[in-house]
Amino acid sequence: MKHKKLIAGIVGIVLGVIITFFIPTPHGLTHAGMIVLASLVTANIFWIFNVIPSFATGLLMLSSWVVLGAVKFEVAYQIFSTTTMWIIIGGLGLGAAATKTGLIKRIALKIMTFFPANFRGQTLALFTAGTIIAPMIPSAHPKTAMSTPIAKGISNALGYKPFGKGSSGLFLAALWGFFVTEASFLSATAQNYAFKGLLPAKAQAQLNWGNWFIMMIPWTIIILIGGYFLLTFLFKPKDDKPVSREFISKQLNELGPMSREEKITATVILIAIVFWILESVFNIPAAITAIIGVSVLVALKVLTPEDFKTRLSWNTIIFIGTVMALGNVMQSAGLTTWLRKILAPAISPIIDNIYITVIALPIIIYLCKFVVVSLISTGTLITIGLLPFFSQMSFSPAIIAIIVTTSVNVWILSYMNAPILTGSAAVQDSMASRGAMAKSSIGYMILNIIGLLVCVPIWQLMGIA
């Protein structure tokens, strides 16, 4: 509809003004809480309809709290001095170096040489390469943009027609390996840190790199094995004979020998991952490890000041920060306590039992994705809605972050998932049919719930469920 953004913006502002100045403050809620609630309503409308860039909406939301007297500046913007923000900045810097030097592409192509040059073999290769590379780059868009052209080259070499079974299957295999497995590793995407940052401090402490990985092992196994059989069942061509690996060999030859910059980047990232895994042993915060790693890469001229300015998605970093600020401010303004009383009848049955939670919550998130496009916005809305109930859950709120990050990845309809749109644009929208996308998404949604259910015994052994 023409002028949709303008209309949505006006509606959002009007609702915010009405809630702030004209609706009497309900019993049990302070005026500061009303201001935060009003800003949240306005911001969500702006985010859903993309009225202005998301990061600008977030900054205006935080500023409104200060201007209208809900909280002081130091409280509103406190999130930008936390370790979570700096691990995101450092992680994105490491990922930028891995992409710039060609290290990621080399690793992916090298892995593919070990598998048969047919549909089954290259599907498995894309799964394997993506899973290995996932924790190295904490941003979905570069991974999807890099992996789908590789899948297209393989598809062409195997003689698959655009939008056919084989082409669709390899496109989805690239996304499955490089994008879907992001939920398996804390460092694989900035949104993992965003959802973690909304949790209470105790729950955040439970979600270090090693614990996250262990918590997700059963889910990862289900997603990889189930995903492989799903894609081969749906998309394997009738004649799946191996062909020459010439395309992959040619791509590797074009890269030439491993450069000095690649070797330095590989070493720094491997050391960083080791320190992240052993964070509790070395007692060095993950953010410090990431910052030192990026500083070393800059000092050794792998990354330049210009790279640091242009290769990091600063608008995304700021947006994530403004989203994470909501958790602390909602508590400070008393909004979480009030919401807990209001929403208790509807929410309590869902969170009373962990098995009910891991079935019901993903379904709620799937439905939300039809309305809220942004992955981070969807996850934030769900997490904020549950914030008031964290204290009465029969399990650790850390599990909420896990469920949210696995469940926002829905792509039944093309508009639902921006990183997948990026991957599709990288191959000129020439590989997968809409039907193939919908089928694979439904398959993932089912496997996701199964994977989460299988995780519950592990979580119970870890004492968090």
Regions found by a protein language model. Give the residues of each.
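Membrane-embedded alpha-helical segments and adjacent helix-loop junctions characteristic
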Residues: 25, 42, 55-161, 311-393
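Alpha-helical transmembrane segments of multi-pass membrane proteins
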Residues: 88, 120-134, 160-182, 207-215, ...
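Membrane-core helix-loop-helix motifs of multi-pass transport proteins
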Residues: 153-237, 420-465
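Hydrophobic, membrane-inserted alpha-helices
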Residues: 13-16, 38-45, 126-131, 174-177, ...
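Alpha-helical transmembrane segments of integral membrane proteins, especially early/N-terminal helices
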Residues: 45-58, 98, 103-104, 178-193, ...
